[in-house]
């Protein structure tokens, strides 16, 4: 399996995804600020992978601490705030830092710093390993839902699926969320072909998902983001499935910009649209999608394509990194605890609290 991140002997190692698919560059660092920069610049990206990386980033930060125990609380408070500020939309990041905070709160008073740091390191490994396990469970629940929803169709043919951005090993530690469902469905003979949209402006679908599919030998075709509607119109897509960066209590889902447009097209053409994400992506403290902070990124991401200027430097740009798909457009939200279909307020609360 592709090694997107790892942590060994105090060193965080990551595959710099900005250079894929043309170059595979692995970077090693023991500096927490360098790890934060990797998250900010999308060298490391994808909500679950960001969460695991955030845990390791906190470990890097505490390993850099050289003061006494009395000075650590203020240092740790600032460290957590610094990590939290790196990607404000990805709730998995906050899930990870919350877990690290819980270890601190439970052990700081009675433990030495050495013992405390060891427990925090163990928690970072657990966050990472849990994400790997969750992907396997999400894939199984997703395939079960597809078999249920497409029982009649699957009697005569396989399915064609649309996915957006990248939700595979490069984003999720394990086999992936949405792409994990696709991988397992393909292995079980349900999938004919995967349609992956380019995912402008950083082309995660074209660069990363296509690379993973080619690596696995799964039939696919890449399309421009605006092409999904005509493929649906012509019967070339049976369903769509994406990941998520944050899901609110009512099922509203923030994901890579362009997801909402695909969901609207799917609804118009009568096709089911699914979300696959771990429970850590669900934020039931937010009632609806309008509460989700939407990151707006550097306008040069549109003005330039991998360093090549394609618009004037003064061209006004609106560059939202995410959009919010209303839960009313989503057929089901697939988690490691099962698929939630129907009443999201009840179902999502159940999987979060159960």
UniProtKB/Swiss-Prot annotation:
Site feature location: Transition state stabilizer: 165
A Pfam family it matches: IF-2B
Pathway listed: Amino-acid biosynthesis; L-methionine biosynthesis via salvage pathway; L-methionine from S-methyl-5-thio-alpha-D-ribose 1-phosphate: step 1/6
InterPro entries xrefs: IF-2B-related, IF-M1Pi, IF_2B-like_C, Initiation_fac_2B_a/b/d, M1Pi_N, NagB/RpiA_transferase-like
GO terms for biological process, alphabetical: L-methionine salvage from methylthioadenosine
Keywords: Amino-acid biosynthesis, Isomerase, Methionine biosynthesis
EC number(s) reported in the record: 5.3.1.23
Binding site for substrate: 45-47, 87, 204, 255-256
Positions of the catalytic residues: 245
Main EC class the enzyme belongs to: isomerase
SUPFAM superfamilies for this protein: NagB/RpiA/CoA transferase-like
Reaction catalysed by this enzyme: 5-(methylsulfanyl)-alpha-D-ribose 1-phosphate = 5-(methylsulfanyl)-D-ribulose 1-phosphate
GO molecular function: S-methyl-5-thioribose-1-phosphate isomerase activity
Biological function: Catalyzes the interconversion of methylthioribose-1-phosphate (MTR-1-P) into methylthioribulose-1-phosphate (MTRu-1-P).
Family, similarity comment: Belongs to the eIF-2B alpha/beta/delta subunits family. MtnA subfamily.
NCBIfam families per record: eIF-2B_rel, PRK05720.1, salvage_mtnA
Designated name of the protein: Methylthioribose-1-phosphate isomerase
């Amino acid at each position: 399996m592709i090694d997107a991140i790892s942590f060994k002997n105090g060193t965080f190692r990551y595959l710099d995804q900005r250079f894929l698919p043309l170059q595979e560059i692995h970077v090693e660092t023991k500096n927490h600020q360098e790890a934060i920069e990797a998250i900010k610049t999308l060298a490391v990206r994808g909500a679950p992978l960001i969460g695991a990386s955030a845990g390791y980033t906190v470990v890097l930060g505490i390993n850099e601490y050289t003061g006494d125990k009395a000075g650590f609380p203020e240092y740790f408070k600032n460290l957590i705030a610094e990590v939290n500020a790196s990607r404000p939309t990805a709730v998995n990041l906050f899930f990870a830092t919350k877990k690290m905070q819980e270890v601190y709160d439970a052990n700081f008073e009675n433990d030495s710093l050495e013992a405390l740091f060891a427990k925090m390191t163990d928690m970072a490994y657990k966050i990472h390993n849990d994400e790997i396990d969750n992907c396997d469970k999400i894939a199984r629940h997703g395939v079960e839902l597809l078999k249920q929803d497409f029982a009649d169709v699957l009697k005569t043919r396989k399915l064609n699926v649309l996915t957006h951005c990248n939700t595979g090993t490069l984003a999720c530690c394990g086999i992936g969320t949405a792409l994990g469902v696709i991988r397992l469905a393909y292995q079980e003979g349900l999938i004919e072909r995967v349609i992956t949209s380019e995912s402008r402006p950083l082309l995660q679908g074209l660069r990363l998902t296509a690379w993973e599919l080619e690596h696995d030998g799964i039939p696919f075709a890449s399309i421009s983001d605006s092409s999904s509607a005509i493929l649906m119109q012509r019967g070339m897509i049976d369903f769509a499935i994406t990941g998520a960066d944050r899901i609110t209590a009512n099922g509203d889902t923030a994901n890579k910009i362009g997801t909402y447009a695909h969901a609207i097209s799917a609804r118009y053409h009568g096709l089911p649209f699914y979300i696959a994400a771990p429970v850590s992506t669900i934020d039931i403290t937010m009632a609806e999608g309008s509460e989700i902070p939407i990151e707006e990124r550097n306008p040069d991401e549109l003005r330039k394509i991998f360093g090549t200027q394609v618009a004037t430097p003064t061209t006004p740009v609106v560059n939202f990194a995410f959009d919010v798909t209303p839960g009313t457009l989503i057929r089901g939200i697939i988690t490691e605890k099962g698929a939630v279909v129907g009443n999201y307020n009840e179902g999502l609360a159940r999987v979060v609290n159960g």
